[in-house]
A protein has these predicted regions:
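Terminal intrinsically disordered, low-complexity tails
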Residues: 35, 39-40
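Cytosolic, long alpha-helical scaffolding segments
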Residues: 44-256
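Short Gly/Ser/Thr- and charged-rich N-terminal loops/segments
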Residues: 28-33
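Tryptophan (W) side chains
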Residues: 16-17
Length: 256
């Protein structure tokens, strides 16, 4: 009887140790799986953290695309303004095209302001981005204002002086487009700035010549009033091109 009991106890002990051993093996496997899963989870967390950091701290370069688009709008509206002054009989249609460009420009400025608010890191100082966008948009607004005056005043005869001033704006707009592409190159920007400054002085001389001619001849008072306002707007557009150039040159020097 005792022998039977001892035998049973021995058998139970063997089974018990087998169970314990199997459990330990399983536990080791579970621990290995847990460690592996933990490592994977940490790797994923690290990757996500890095992705977020890259997104947060990477510079948003789309601002330069927006600046280039605004510069192109200046160019297209300037060309249209020159056509309008050459053919005032078609002023209403051309002015409508300029107005569309002006509206598109406002939409770009809105996008720029939104990006300033949502970008963690900007390629330029936020104040410079805002100022440059404002200056570029101002040129388009002034060109639109000049076109609107030609329509409002029922101008039917072209004046060579007005066309020549518009041509200065066209040439300055081309220089602005090149300036935007070279905004981080101080030496190139200095060249663009000098070129636009020469155009601005040419515009001032043309303005004085055109306004002087209005009062030098026996012009009807209503024509003097009309064209004085138009010449004022054209000269303002040329001056604003120079202001854009000054902002671009300042940005180039800051970021050289």
């Amino acid at each position: 009887m005792v022998d039977a009991i001892l035998t049973a106890v021995c058998v139970l002990r063997v089974h018990w140790w087998r169970v314990i051993h199997a459990f330990e093996i399983r536990s080791e496997a579970l621990r290995a799986v847990t460690v592996r899963h933990t490592a994977i989870r940490r790797a994923v967390d690290s990757f996500l953290s890095l992705s977020i950091a890259v997104k947060l701290f990477s510079r948003d370069e789309t601002f330069f695309d927006h600046f280039r688009q605004l510069a192109e709008y200046i160019g297209s509206s300037a060309v249209l303004l020159k056509q309008l002054l050459e053919h005032p009989a078609d002023a209403a249609r051309i002015a409508a095209e300029i107005k569309k460009v002006e509206t598109d420009g406002d939409a770009i400025v809105y996008l720029i302001n939104q990006r300033i608010d949502t970008s963690f890191v900007t390629p330029l100082d936020r104040e410079d981005i805002h100022l440059l966008a404002k200056r570029l948009d101002n040129v388009i607004d002034i060109i639109n204002g000049a076109a609107r005056r030609v329509v409002m005043f029922r101008v039917i005869v072209s004046r060579a002086g007005g066309v020549r001033m518009a041509d200065v704006i066209v040439r300055a707009s081309r220089e602005i487009l090149e300036s935007v592409a070279d905004v981080t190159k101080p030496k190139r920007m200095a060249e663009h700035s000098r070129a636009i400054k020469v155009m601005e002085e040419e515009g001032d001389a043309l303005y004085a010549e055109c306004v002087g001619a209005l009062f030098a001849h026996d012009e009807p008072a209503i024509e003097v009033l009309k064209w004085k306002e138009i010449f004022d707007a054209l000269e303002q557009a040329i001056d604003e091109c120079d202001d854009v150039s000054n902002v671009l040159e300042s940005i180039a020097l800051k970021n050289s």
